[in-house]
Amino acid sequence: MKEAGILFEELVSIMEKLRSPEGCEWDRKQTHESLKPYLIEECYELIEAIDEKNDDMMKEELGDVLLQVVFHAQIARERGAFTIEDVIRTLNEKLIRRHPHVFGDSPGYSYKQWEDIKAQEKGKKKSSRIGEINPLVPALSMARRIQENASQVGFDWKDPEGVYEKIEEELKELKEAKDPRELEEEFGDLLFSIVNLSRFLNVDPESALRKATRKFVERFKKMEELIEKDGLVLEELPIEKLDEYWEKAKGGDET
């Protein structure tokens, strides 16, 4: 742990140097706003490394995310807002405060206690147990979080069968929808129910959809290779022929 502290101090010093007049022009120009796309990108690259179970890649991407934390803290320090020490101190205090069953005299963990503590931190009256909608969080993840919050207070299906039935009901309503407004609403209800099912199956919907999309892209590229190998042009083939090549590409997945 002592070495980690030394290395972290070195990282902070490196960032200070990069932001100094003698440092890097690009780093000096960055602001909280200009760094937002990089923060999002690094987080998704870390998620990709986790999905691929690639430890070397995960190690590197965790470092890139940490860099973003140090970068923003340095910019804030220059503005006189807060320092990296403030960031760490605030985090430490929050972790201890939110785990009284570990660091205090509380007998055990409870969801209600967790929510009460969070409400006290925000200095306001208790908010709804269902949580708030964050427009910046991906829709699938937000739906999953809201459903988990509802489940914590007992508002949930007893088993997956109820969710399967709900999906069939929503699909039927989608087929019967007429105008664009109805279609959007019913499609949203169907997606919400599918995300609900993901909870019961212990499947992360974002990860599952990301993997399915990646699989589709890889198969499509394989199909393109097979078509080109046969001296044909993809755009000129009828759908029936494309389906044949698609099946061949799928077969290649299993080899």
Curated annotation (Swiss-Prot):
- Which residues does the record give as Mg(2+) binding sites? E169, E186, D189
Annotated catalysed reactions: diphosphate + H2O = 2 phosphate + H(+); a ribonucleoside 5'-triphosphate + H2O = a ribonucleoside 5'-phosphate + diphosphate + H(+); a 2'-deoxyribonucleoside 5'-triphosphate + H2O = a 2'-deoxyribonucleoside 5'-phosphate + diphosphate + H(+)
Role noted for this protein? Catalyzes the hydrolysis of all eight canonical ribonucleoside triphosphates (NTP) and deoxyribonucleoside triphosphates (dNTP) to their corresponding nucleoside monophosphates ((d)NMP) and PPi and subsequently hydrolyzes the resultant PPi to Pi. The NTPase activity with deoxyribonucleoside triphosphates as substrate is higher than corresponding ribonucleoside triphosphates. dGTP is the best substrate among the deoxyribonucleoside triphosphates, and GTP is the best among the ribonucleoside triphosphates.
Which residues are involved in binding ATP 2? K215, F216, V217, E218, R219, W246
Q: State what inhibits or activates this protein.
A: Inhibited by AMPCPP (alpha,beta-methyleneadenosine triphosphate).
Please list the coiled coil stretches. none
EC number of the protein: 3.6.1.1, 3.6.1.9
List the Gene Ontology MF annotations in alphabetical order.
ATP binding; inorganic diphosphate phosphatase activity; metal ion binding; nucleoside triphosphate diphosphatase activity
Q: Consequence of mutating E176A?
A: Has little effects on the NTPase activity
Q: Does the keyword Magnesium apply?
A: yes
Q: What does the record note on quaternary structure?
A: Homodimer.
Enzyme class per UniProt: hydrolase
- Annotated keywords: ATP-binding, Hydrolase, Magnesium, Metal-binding, Nucleotide-binding
- What's the effect of swapping R98A? Reduces the NTPase activity to 10% of the wild-type activity
Q: What is the effect of changing E173A?
A: Has little effects on the NTPase activity
Q: How does activity depend on temperature?
A: Optimum temperature is about 80 degrees Celsius. MazG is very stable at high temperature, and no change is detected up to 85 degrees Celsius.
What CDD domains is this protein classified in?
A: NTP-PPase_MazG_Cterm, NTP-PPase_MazG_Nterm
Q: What is this protein called?
A: Nucleoside triphosphate pyrophosphohydrolase/pyrophosphatase MazG
Q: Name one GO biological process term.
A: dTTP catabolic process
Q: Which cofactor does it need?
A: Mg(2+)
Q: What organism does this protein naturally occur in?
A: Thermotoga maritima (strain ATCC 43589 / DSM 3109 / JCM 10099 / NBRC 100826 / MSB8)
Task: Provide the residue positions that the database annotates as binding ATP 1.
Answer: G162, V163, Y164, E165, K166, E169, E182, L183, E184, E185, D189
